[in-house]
A protein has these predicted regions:
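Extended alpha-helical, oligomerization-prone segments that build pores/tubes and scaffolds
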Residues: 1-517
Length: 517
């Protein structure tokens, strides 16, 4: 089988990317946007003059579950441990455990990464992180004055040291010492005079003024959160390992691409991939995307350095070399130009869902079963408030022929006077309105119990157990235990999927790239 031609490879890649984007838009975008809006307390506005109250069930559920999940997964000495296969592996496993945990929690902002990762999973069905090796350069420039040959040699022996400026002159101390010797020659004994003459015949010692620039290259592992709405994967993939396409659609400025070392001509020509339609569904409303969502009109002489281009940055498994075996390749591509196409050991993403669906990588978000309850509770709260308002300020029938002063009637001051010319019984009558406040409260309580049954997040394991005094100690303990088990189950799923994959990925990256401590 012949090696894939570039056009064939691009056709396969573009087709898989388009399929993955379409699959996400069709199956997940609407739910994700709905969940984020519910989490932020956004709801349809009621008619003017009616209650605009919103129930925050999704927010309460997510924020109640998050601290416990963080504590379960991140509070120990080690987030994860590597187990030795045999006795000869014990030392390596111990070192790998210590170092990879150090990479996650110390070299990277581990707590913030896990906080975002878990919250993404609870809200968006899937949380995604990406681990990769990157090299950074630290350039330092120092000036040295009056250093010797030996000192200069030692400075230049440092890795990546470069002399920018250099000048030399006689060492003033050596010049002064020689003058002192010449003045004392007449009083020296023959042996001392012979040594002094020999010294005076040598060249004057030189000293140097130099400016040295040192460039230190240091590589390390980075772990970044990936916005779920930007993440794309082979449709219907059952696991991360089973996917043939894994990546993200992200925005890079042309300046960023040039700094990353991509071909300048390709950077000039590259055009954007069409982004997933639900990019605005993120918690931050993807403010940065909106700020760049303009129709730039750059001419050939204009500065296009800040223009944002949406590119696919990810991995595809394909038989590129024609040997009959599909291999992973890392690709960075716009809609018309490929910036990177290189062989890779595997992809660098790790993903997890809090509630698994059999035979599917992307499961159910904790927010999914709560959103309908929030919609119902919002309606109940509004009816409760509207009912109280109508009870305290009922509508009134007015006999317009009874001489009632309407201005007095509409002025709802406490102790106010309403003037009229006929008895009140014949002039005014309240319109009967059924008070549904009690029924609305019962509906809200029913919704709360349904939310607890669906999520396992109860008022007892949230610390909101004011009426637990009316329960038996055994009954409350059973409720708390059931809720804790649901959270422990979610934590176990996250540990067995995304976290385990992340630590395996980090060990592979460190083993491949780390050349010094």
């Amino acid at each position: 089988m012949a090696k894939l031609h570039e056009d064939q490879f691009h056709k396969i890649l573009d087709g898989q990317i388009e399929e993955a984007i379409s699959w996400q838009e069709e199956h997940y975008s609407r739910d994700r946007k709905r969940n984020y809006e519910a989490y932020l307390g956004q709801a349809d506005a009621a008619p003017a003059g009616r209650s605009q109250a919103v129930s925050w069930d999704v927010f309460e559920t997510i924020e109640a579950a998050l601290p416990d999940l963080i504590e379960i997964l991140c509070s120990g000495d080690h987030i994860a441990e590597f187990e030795p296969v045999g006795e000869e592996d014990e030392q390596f496993a111990e070192q790998a455990t210590d170092y990879i945990n150090y990479v996650v929690m110390k070299q990277n902002p581990g707590f913030l990464i896990f906080n975002t990762w878990i919250k993404d999973a609870l809200l968006s069905k899937i949380g995604v992180v990406r681990a990769y090796w990157a090299t950074s350069e630290k350039v330092t420039t120092k000036e040295y004055t009056g250093i010797s040959d030996d000192d200069l040699t030692q400075l230049l022996s440092a890795e990546d040291a470069e002399v920018i400026e250099q000048s030399q002159q006689d060492d003033e101390r050596d010049v002064a010492q020689r003058a002192h010797m010449r003045a004392a020659l007449n009083v020296m004994d023959p042996m001392q005079r012979q040594l002094a003459d020999a010294y005076l015949q040598t060249p004057v010692r030189q000293v140097y003024d130099v400016t040295i620039r040192t460039t230190r290259k240091r590589g390390r592992v980075y772990v970044d959160n990936v916005q779920p709405e930007n993440f794309i994967i082979t449709p219907r993939a059952k696991t991360m390992a089973a996917a043939d396409l894994v990546g993200e659609i992200k925005s890079l400025s042309r300046s960023d691409m040039r700094e990353l070392g991509y071909d300048k001509e390709k950077v000039r020509e590259i055009q954007s991939f069409e982004a997933p339609q639900d990019r605005s569904a993120g918690i931050a409303q993807t403010a940065t995307d909106e700020s760049h969502d303009h129709n730039y009109d750059f001419d050939s002489e204009g500065d296009d350095a800040t223009e944002e281009v949406r590119v696919f940055d990810g991995f595809i498994r394909v038989d590129y070399d024609g040997d009959g075996i599909a291999e992973w390749r890392r690709v960075v591509r716009g809609s018309n130009v490929t910036l990177v196409n290189e062989e890779a050991e595997g992809h660098d993403f790790a993903a997890m869902s809090p509630i698994l669906i059999p035979h599917s990588l992307i499961g159910i978000a904790l927010a999914d079963p709560v959103v309908p309850i929030q919609t119902s509770s919002t309606a109940m709260q509004r009816q409760y408030i509207d009912s109280l308002m109508l009870a305290n300020n009922p509508r009134t029938y007015v006999n317009t022929t009874a001489g009632v002063n309407l201005n007095d009637l509409l002025d709802n001051r406490i102790g106010g006077i309403v003037r009229g010319t006929q008895p009140m019984q014949t002039a005014l009558a309240p319109l009967l309105t059924h008070n549904v406040a009690d029924s609305a409260l019962q509906g809200i309580e029913f919704n709360d119990s349904k939310r607890e049954a669906r999520t396992g997040i109860t008022r007892y394991n949230q610390g909101l157990d004011a009426d637990s005094l009316n329960k038996t100690a055994t009954g409350v303990a059973k409720i708390m235990t059931a809720g804790d088990r649901r959270k422990l189950m979610m934590a176990r799923i996250m540990a067995e999927t995304g976290i385990k994959d992340l630590f395996r990925l980090l060990l592979r990256i460190v083993t491949e790239n780390q050349d010094k401590p």
